[in-house]
């Protein structure tokens, strides 16, 4: 803004102020008007102010007079009297007053609301009995004033005078209601019961038009008086009545607000002065309240059912009552020989039902303090006691009313009412079924506890209430009643589940007992086999015809049998036959025996090193010519043995038998060595194939597993890194490249490498000499299975490729992935491996009970030259099987038959699949400890 603009603005303001000063009144004018006090004579100033006020008042009156209506208008408005009026002043005043009131009343009547609005606003009071007769609807609270005319607001009861001038003589609705409600409790219950009319003939509709009708609390109200004349009264009276009625209706509203949404008060306990509502809204509200009552009744039934099971049994009932309870779980009760006539009216509620049935009461629940107020009131209603007061008063009233004498009498009350014949179920669907002339039978779907012959009162009373509710609701409330009837079957289905559980437990106990019996039988069989081993040890050169098995025994040991591991998993084994595992203490032992089904293995390390290996038995038959075993001469990976190793005493059992109708052939291509050492092993492996990694893969897996399991124990002698080799245990058709060599030729080809004179090596050599001599096994088999016979350089071993081992499958496609070492042995010798119990279900005594617990693991290893080196074995299943990584801490090199107890090592599952024959759910990975000790 520039300086020029500022000057222009100031100039404009100056001009405005100058104009205002020119138009300002002088001081004299201000003094004359009383705005400013005069400078002189203050007394004159005050007098002047009074004169100004008088002048102002006069001016106001003059304006009013100028604006007043004409005389004719005042006469028309009855403010001024007419010139022809009576000379008496009192008569004129009365006439003017009446005319004025009449005009006011006519104007209000022309603008008055309709009758429904008057009822909603509680301006038009109507008695309950009058409503039932005039309206004739199903709900006592519903008010339908469509039959009223516009003059019904001025209706007076017959006791009231027709013309009343003063306000005090007009009885208000509030004054009428207490007089009606206070007369009802004055009657005794016996009088109230006598007033209720029973009989089937009272169901007709004519009872609604009778002079004596039943109101909501079961009492009869005489309405012999004629209906009040609904005529318009004289004009002076209604203004006072109107003014009083406009002021009074606000008083009863707080009584309605005291009701809570979860408290249901039946119509017989509601005051008649409750404000009426619209018919449609009242119907909805009534239905909601009745549905809420149904829910409360259902809760009370279930709670009372639970309490009844704890309370002592009531006195012994009649014989017919016992017959009724034994014939059906539903208790059928007949209210009386005739149905109550008041069921046709919708106002009958649980109070009438209790009176009709006989005031049934029952034992109190124990936890009264935990019950809700509504539940306590319901118990009080069942006993006919008042329900008013606080919760403590209700509890004390219930405790005072329930003593042993009353409890006994109350429990014996319903017995005369109950029927002795088989129950008839009459479903209550709507009020139409109650209009028959037959006795009404109510079925209680909430059955009493089995131990209590006396039925539950709450169930019967609640069904009586349901019948009343269905009478009030009609077909609309039929669904909740049927739902209540259908609730109990769901509760009755729970006992079969418990029975099924008991049956399952008993079945499992029976299975455990059977397994224990079979375990004992197999223990006897193992003892017999041990004796045979001892005999064969003393006479190892007998002919094949006299021998039952080939035995090489070094030490005699007891063969205890453990059942704990079988019992641990017996609950998860349902349809699999189990065979026991042979568990040896003190010294390590290896047993390879026949199996009836499945692949199993078990090791228990509680007392000593124990290991059991089995391979599955093919379920097919092979021709006789396939029973021979031919080993081919192929290059084998050499191994270096520690010269100072000494083999401990061991007992190795290799038995052969030919199973019935099963003659499988097993093809073994030599070039690998089985190296097994026992540990805490309980796996189940599907021996579809093995894969071993050497070189880089071996080192990486070895370092990873050693780091995970025992980080403080690294491999002491790492091996060189040759290219990785793999060994697969596969199945192929029985094809051989050449005929097996003779015994003499095999003995010539056998290297003589037992110069160290170790006892373990000599025992192995002697053992395989016996095998070769009696079973016609080529001598190459001893080269590949006895590592002490060959010693080569580590570099030669690293450079050699590992050949394959093939196991010929049987023709059966189901078990084609399974091979057994026992089949290999029994197909070679034709003699049974185990004697006894072959005809029964436990003829395979070593395997059947181990199918769900473990599976033998055959390690086809090409071990590195260093005896301190660790080896990893990776199982690569061909089908759906379990892959495992097995790592081993540094151990001393020993023979392949040596079983030792080195530090524990872990068997970690790489992946979990569902096996083709068994389930991997039985695997316990934390128990899979496997020791592999091979030295080639």
Swiss-Prot record:
Residues 146-185, 234-258, 401-422, 707-755 are annotated as: Disordered. Residues 368-402 form the SAP domain. GO terms for cellular component: cytoplasm; nucleus. Residues 160-170, 729-738 have a biased composition (Polar residues). Residues 497-542 form a coiled coil. GO terms for biological process: actin cytoskeleton organization; positive regulation of transcription by RNA polymerase II; smooth muscle cell differentiation. It comes from the Eukaryota. Its main location: cytoplasm. One of its GO terms (molecular function) is actin monomer binding. Disulfide bonds: none annotated. Pfam families: RPEL (PF02755), SAP (PF02037). Residues 404-416 have a biased composition (Low complexity). Residues 239-254 have a biased composition (Basic and acidic residues). RPEL repeats lie at residues 15-40, 59-84, 103-128. It is found in: Cytoplasm; Nucleus. SMART domains: RPEL, SAP. Keywords: Actin-binding, Coiled coil, Cytoplasm, Nucleus, Repeat, Transcription, Transcription regulation. A motif (Bipartite Nuclear localization signal) lies at residues 62-100. Residues 712-725 have a biased composition (Pro residues). Transcription coactivator that associates with the serum response factor (srf) transcription factor to control expression of genes regulating the cytoskeleton during development, morphogenesis and cell migration. The srf-mrtfa complex activity responds to Rho GTPase-induced changes in cellular globular actin (G-actin) concentration, thereby coupling cytoskeletal gene expression to cytoskeletal dynamics. Mrtfa binds G-actin via its RPEL repeats, regulating activity of the mrtfa-srf complex. Activity is also regulated by filamentous actin (F-actin) in the nucleus. Interacts with srf, forming the srf-mrtfa nuclear complex which binds the 5'-CArG-3' consensus motif (CArG box) on DNA via srf. Interacts (via RPEL repeats) with globular actin (G-actin), thereby regulating its subcellular location and activity of the complex formed with srf. The N-terminal region is required for nuclear localization and the C-terminal region mediates transcriptional activity. This is Myocardin-related transcription factor A. The gene is mrtfa.
């Amino acid at each position: 803004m520039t300086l020029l603009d500022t000057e222009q603005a100031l100039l404009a303001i100056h001009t405005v102020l100058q104009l205002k000063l020119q138009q300002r009144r002088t001081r004299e004018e201000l003094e004359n008007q009383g705005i400013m006090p005069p400078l002189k004579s203050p007394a004159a100033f005050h007098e002047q102010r009074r004169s100004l006020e008088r002048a102002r008042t006069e001016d106001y009156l003059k304006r009013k007079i100028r604006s007043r209506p004409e005389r004719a208008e005042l006469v028309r408005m009855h403010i001024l009297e007419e010139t022809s009026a009576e000379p008496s002043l009192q008569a004129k005043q009365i006439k003017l007053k009446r005319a004025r009131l009449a005009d006011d009343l006519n104007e209000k009547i022309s603008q008055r609301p309709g009758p429904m609005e008057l009822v909603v606003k509680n301006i038009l009071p109507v008695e309950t009995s009058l409503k039932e007769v005039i309206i004739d609807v199903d709900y006592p609270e519903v008010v339908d004033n469509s039959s009223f005319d516009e003059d019904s607001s001025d209706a007076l009861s017959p006791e009231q005078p027709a013309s009343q001038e003063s306000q005090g003589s007009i009885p208000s609705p509030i004054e009428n209601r207490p007089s009606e409600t206070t007369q009802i409790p004055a009657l005794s219950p016996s009088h109230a019961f006598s007033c209720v009319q029973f009989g089937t003939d009272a169901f007709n509709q004519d009872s609604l038009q009778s002079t004596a009708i039943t109101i909501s609390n079961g009492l009869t109200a005489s309405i012999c008086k004629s209906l009040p004349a609904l005529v318009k009264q004289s004009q002076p009276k209604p203004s006072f009545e109107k003014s009083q009625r406009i002021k009074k209706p606000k008083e009863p509203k707080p009584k309605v607000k005291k009701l809570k949404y979860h408290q249901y008060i039946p119509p017989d306990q509601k005051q008649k002065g409750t404000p009426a509502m619209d018919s449609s809204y009242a119907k909805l509200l009534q239905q909601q309240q009745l549905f809420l009552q149904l829910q409360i009744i259902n809760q009370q039934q279930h709670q009372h059912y639970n309490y009844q099971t704890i309370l002592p049994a009531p006195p012994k009932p009649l014989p017919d009552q016992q017959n009724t309870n034994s014939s059906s779980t539903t208790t059928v009760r007949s209210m009386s020989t005739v149905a109550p006539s008041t069921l046709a009216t919708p106002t009958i509620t649980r109070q009438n039902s209790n009176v009709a049935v006989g005031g049934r009461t029952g034992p109190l629940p124990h936890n009264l303090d935990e019950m809700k107020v509504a539940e306590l009131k319901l118990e009080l209603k069942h006993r006919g006691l008042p329900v008013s007061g606080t919760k403590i008063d209700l509890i004390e009233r219930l405790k005072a009313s329930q003593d042993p004498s009353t409890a006994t009498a109350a429990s014996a009350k319903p017995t005369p009412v109950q029927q002795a014949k088989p129950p008839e179920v009459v479903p209550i669907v709507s009020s139409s079924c109650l209009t028959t002339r037959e006795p009404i039978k109510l079925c209680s779907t909430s059955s009493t506890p089995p131990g209590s012959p006396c039925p539950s009162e709450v169930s019967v009373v609640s069904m009586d209430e349901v019948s009343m509710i269905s009478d009030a609701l009609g077909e609309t409330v039929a669904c909740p009643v049927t739902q209540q009837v259908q609730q109990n079957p769901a509760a009755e289905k729970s006992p079969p589940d418990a029975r099924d559980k008991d049956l399952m437990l008993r079945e499992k106990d029976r299975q455990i007992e059977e397994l224990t019996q079979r375990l004992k039988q197999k223990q006897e069989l193992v003892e017999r086999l041990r004796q045979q081993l001892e005999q064969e040890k003393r006479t190892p050169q007998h002919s094949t015809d006299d021998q039952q098995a080939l035995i090489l025994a070094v030490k005699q040991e007891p063969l205890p049998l453990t059942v704990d591991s079988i019992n641990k998993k017996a609950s998860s084994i349902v349809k699999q036959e189990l065979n026991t595992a042979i568990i040896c203490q003190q010294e390590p032992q290896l047993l390879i025996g026949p199996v009836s089904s499945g692949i199993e293995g078990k090791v228990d390390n509680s007392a000593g090193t124990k290991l059991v290996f089995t391979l599955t038995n093919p379920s097919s038959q092979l021709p006789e010519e396939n029973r021979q075993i031919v080993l081919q001469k192929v290059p084998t990976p050499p191994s270096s043995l520690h010269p100072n190793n000494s083999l401990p005493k061991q007992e190795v059992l290799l038995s052969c038998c030919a199973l019935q109708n099963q003659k499988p052939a097993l093809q073994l291509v030599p070039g690998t060595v089985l190296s097994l050492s026992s540990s805490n092993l309980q796996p189940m492996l599907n021996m579809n194939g093995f894969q071993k990694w050497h070189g880089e893969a071996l080192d990486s897996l070895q370092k990873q597993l050693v780091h995970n399991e025992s980080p403080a124990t690294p491999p002491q002698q790492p091996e060189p890194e040759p290219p990785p080799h793999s060994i697969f245990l596969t199945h192929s058709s029985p094809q051989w490249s050449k005929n097996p060599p003779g015994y003499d030729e095999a003995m010539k080809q056998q290297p003589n490498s037992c110069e160290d004179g170790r006892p373990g090596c000599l025992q192995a050599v002697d053992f395989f000499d016996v095998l070769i001599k009696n079973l016609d096994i080529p001598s190459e088999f001893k080269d590949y299975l006895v590592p002490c016979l060959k010693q080569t350089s580590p570099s030669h071993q690293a450079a050699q490729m590992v050949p394959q081992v093939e196991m010929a499958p049987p023709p059966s496609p189901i078990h084609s992935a399974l091979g057994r070492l026992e089949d290999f042995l029994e197909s070679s010798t034709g003699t049974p491996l185990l004697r006894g119990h072959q005809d029964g279900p436990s003829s395979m005594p070593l395997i059947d009970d181990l199918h769900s617990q473990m599976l033998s693991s055959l390690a086809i290893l090409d071990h590195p030259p260093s005896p301190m080196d660790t080896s990893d074995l990776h199982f690569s299943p061909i089908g759906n099987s379990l892959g495992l990584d097995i790592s081993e801490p540094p151990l001393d090199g020993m023979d392949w038959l040596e079983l030792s107890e080195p530090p524990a090592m872990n068997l970690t599952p790489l992946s979990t699949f569902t096996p083709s024959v068994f389930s991997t759910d039985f695997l316990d990975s934390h128990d899979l400890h496997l020791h592999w000790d091979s030295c080639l």
